[in-house]
Amino acid sequence: KSDTIRETKYVYDTKNRLVSYTDPEGRTETYTYDCNSNLTKTVDKNGNTLKNTYDNKNRLTERTAKEKKTGKETVHTYRYNAYGDVAVQDDTQFVYGDVSGQVTKETTKLTKNKDVVKNYTYDSNGNKSTFSVKAGEDTKLSLSYEYDGSSRLISVKDSEGNQAVSYTYDTEGSLSERQAANGLKTTYGYDYQNRLTSMTNETGKGVVSKYSSTYLKN
C-alpha cells in the first residue's frame, strides 16, 4: 500500500500576482492582468472564461462570461457618473442622494413603453426608511422601515401600516427573534462569545426546523 501525495499548487508572476491555481485533482484556474494589475481574464477549472474591460480610471466597464460547454455569453456593461458611482448597469439607471451618496432611484427598462422604478429614502443616520417598486403606473410594493436608538431594524410595514416583519434583540445587541406576518417565528441563540449556536423556525402549529452548532473552546 502506498500513500498518494495530494497537493495544491499556486503560481505567481514577478509582481506577486496569482496567475494559476491547481487543485489536488489537477484542475487548473488561470488569471491574466493588464499593466495596471486589473484582472482581465479568468479561466476556471471547467474552461469557462470571464473577461473584464476597464476605462482609463481602472473602473470596470464590461464583464463577459462565456460557458465552455454551451458557448453561451453573458455581457454586463457599466457607466459611471462624475463621482465615480455606477450610473448605468446594463438596462438599469441609478440616481444617488446628494448628501448620503446612497442610491435613491433605480430605473430599469422593462419594455419599450414601461419602466420598473425602485425608490429609496433614508433617515438622518443613513438607514433605509422607505422602499417602493412601480411597474409603469402600478405600485407593486411599498414598505417602510423602523429602527431603534442603535439603528437596529425593528419592524417593516406595508403601505397600509400592517407589520410585515418585526425584529427583537438581546442585551448584547444580537438578533434574538424574527416574527413574520405569516406566523413564522425564528429565534436565535448565542454562546458566551456571541457566536450563533441555535436557530429555530416555528409556527402556531409547532417547530418547522431547527439548527444548532457547537464550537471548540479556545
Predicted regions and their residues:
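Beta-strand elements of repeat-based all-beta scaffolds
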Residues: 1-23, 27-44, 48-158, 163-179, ...
